[in-house]
Amino acid sequence: MSKKDNELNHLAIIMDGNGRWAKKRHKPRFVGHREGMDNVERITLAANQLGIKVLTLYAFSTENWARPKEEVAYLMNLPVRFFDKYMPTLMENNVKVNIMGYLDELPEKTYKIVQRAMSETVNNTGLILNFAFNYGSRREITSAVKELGGMIESGSLKSEEITESMISDHLMTGNFGKYRDPDLLIRTSGEQRISNFLLWQLAYSELAFSEKNWPDFDKDDLKEFVDEYKHRNRRFGKVDESDS
């Protein structure tokens, strides 16, 4: 196993536990979401310092619309609060913002702020802070299949020409090139499931789970998980010679 194989270039995090964090402190759920928002800034800077190239954060799923209306309204306003508060810090640290998801379904104010964040950081060359917002992996894969099907129907593509790489290119992470698939997925709050997140891209990703709720997950926790990842034996379906 070469050292290069265990470089952590793309880290994905399911930021879970904001509500539980608030409940433990006898506070409303929105307080947990607010604290979770502030932690995004801290973890982004920590990931940047660790040399991570892409940080993908699961911020709002296509299923989250089923939550109480007041909570959804608060979550839709979080990008506005986040970028208004932290855009100067992101610019100072050369962070490039990307938002993937079905953005045209967002409220107008939310849509405008995420588009502005991407536009203002488009020339930054550091860590890519990639938010999955109004995102669902099954829908993403379905959309990719429809795109490829349309190409076949138009005659610009033959079905036998479709490859796994081509499917990857048509997913929302396709623009990340060689970094499009996460090396490591971390989920906070002790839950151990992937919740319709990056189902195709996580095929050979390493998985890790933290008992801490997202607002409590700090830079030391991140470094501990990154260090542990670097010592894992990533097989990618192959046989480890040391086991034979």
UniProtKB/Swiss-Prot annotation:
One of its GO terms (cellular component) is cytosol. Its EC number is 2.5.1.-. Substrate binds at residues 17-21, 29, 33, 61-63, 65, 67, 187, 193-195. Pfam families: Prenyltransf. Homodimer. Belongs to the UPP synthase family. It comes from Lactobacillus acidophilus (strain ATCC 700396 / NCK56 / N2 / NCFM). NCBIfam families: PRK14830.1 (NF011405), uppS (TIGR00055). GO terms for molecular function: ditrans,polycis-undecaprenyl-diphosphate synthase [(2E,6E)-farnesyl-diphosphate specific] activity; magnesium ion binding; manganese ion binding. Keywords: Magnesium, Metal-binding, Transferase. Binds 2 magnesium ions per subunit. This is Isoprenyl transferase. HAMAP family: ISPT (MF_01139). It is an enzyme of class 2 (transferase).
